């Protein structure tokens, strides 16, 4: 079948008629379907049920350094959680802040802080006039919705088999109003692309005109391999350090597709200056 963009108008009308009939037939069945995305099936949830037995009235609520987790916790997370999530992201433990169960909430909070307070002592984005944000497409609509919510102008960057088109990215960041880019570097939806080594190195070497430009590196699927041999992603934080450019990356991950999505852990990792 030819792509819709290559078909004549009459053929498109005929196809629309067929699809409309199919849609009407589906509606007549009055199905109640759960169309939510990224939702583990009951069989996967059953794999982690034993986690519910790890904490009881006698054991399991004291951390290795004696913090009672039944009470208020630590601002940046308990040591065990920081160690686990640091290992997942391939970063030092002291760069990690553990949040709630939603990495998307942490991304929202980071962008909100950038607009309201600025980045690393810089001028708040809200006071800088027009703000642009790079959005690799196809990509994650909820990322884009965050920056759109705060009034940023979304600028599309086409994806390639290597990741975002870096020639385009490098050209756009010459504009000081471009403040960041959204990235899902491993198994990026919907194409499942993992960024190439060259793409990661070019991100690490970026010298944007805006000092407060940040790569929002959502490494959501960093350990989510479907097969015994998974893809390998070059470590952006380490590559950026080689370029003395580690401030440029803000990394996120979570356990939402590993254990129970509603009660997992999310984390942000960034340089000490950030």
List PLM regions with ranges.
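N-terminal "arm"/small-domain region of PLP-dependent enzymes with the aminotransferase-like
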Residues: 2-80, 86-87
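Core-facing hydrophobic residues within beta-strands of well-ordered domains
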Residues: 30-32, 178, 249
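Active-site donor-binding loop signature of nucleotide-sugar glycosyltransferases
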Residues: 37, 159, 254
